[in-house]
Amino acid sequence: MGGYTTISTTGIQGFSGICLAPDGSGFIVASDRGGVYKASFSGEATTLYVETAGFGLDCEGVTVDPATGDVYFVLEREKQEVRRVRAPEYSESEVLAVINEGTFNSGLEAITWRGDGTLMVGNQANPCLLLRLSATDGSIISRREITGGITDISDLYYDSKRNALWIADSETRTINLCDLQGNVQKSYSVSFIDNGEGLYVDREHQCIWMSDDTTSQIYKISFSNL
């Protein structure tokens, strides 16, 4: 792990998840105060899918099917839902699954594309859970409780090269390389990030992108031999 640079974003608050846009134009980001946005590499944000009723969507994690461009996201607080918005319109969301495993404000927090037609979803805490779901009908394929090493599943990234998971833990301010059961293999401190709730591994640029829920900044953290 090397140094880092930051990108300040405009037009996004409650920055809770991040992934690269499939066309390479920037990021798709989750906001816990509205929904899903696109952000350029210079930080300008545009709306992708939001709902403005009440306090808006408590969107905590986001991922993309690179083949179709469909966006999947998870909602916390009252709803505890996995949703999908289909490309290219991104005009309407559909509920893929309802998962009531966590407590208030400690529920669904993370989601990542597995590349085999399935999704990995993380329940934040109490309990820390890894759930594997069908991306077609939302059925649960497997369920794994993490009882050590991770205190808070803040975001997930499935690493197809390693067949492993990267887990962001905002409570301990760490990035963790784990096996598919959530057992920590290696841990990296990101103490310079106040509330790192978004994580995406980018081998093309030899970095890990993280988003800070407190400041709405994006961090580009250099890594060698990813």
Q: Predicted segment positions?
A:
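Structural signal for beta-propeller blades
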Residues: 35-37, 79-82, 127-130, 173-175, ...
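Short loop/turn segments that connect beta-strands within beta-propeller blades
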Residues: 40-44, 85-90, 134-138, 179-183, ...
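Conserved beta-propeller blade signature
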Residues: 26-30, 70-74, 118-122, 164-167, ...
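Beta-rich, blade/repeat-based domains predominating
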Residues: 10-23, 54-67, 101-117, 148-162, ...
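Beta-propeller domains
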Residues: 28-50
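A short beta-strand motif characteristic of beta-propeller blades
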Residues: 2-10, 45-53, 91-102, 139-148, ...
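Short loop/turn segments immediately following the C-termini of beta-strands
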Residues: 31-33, 76-78, 123-126, 170, ...
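Blade-level signature of beta-propeller repeat domains, shared across WD40, Kelch, NHL, RCC1
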Residues: 198-226
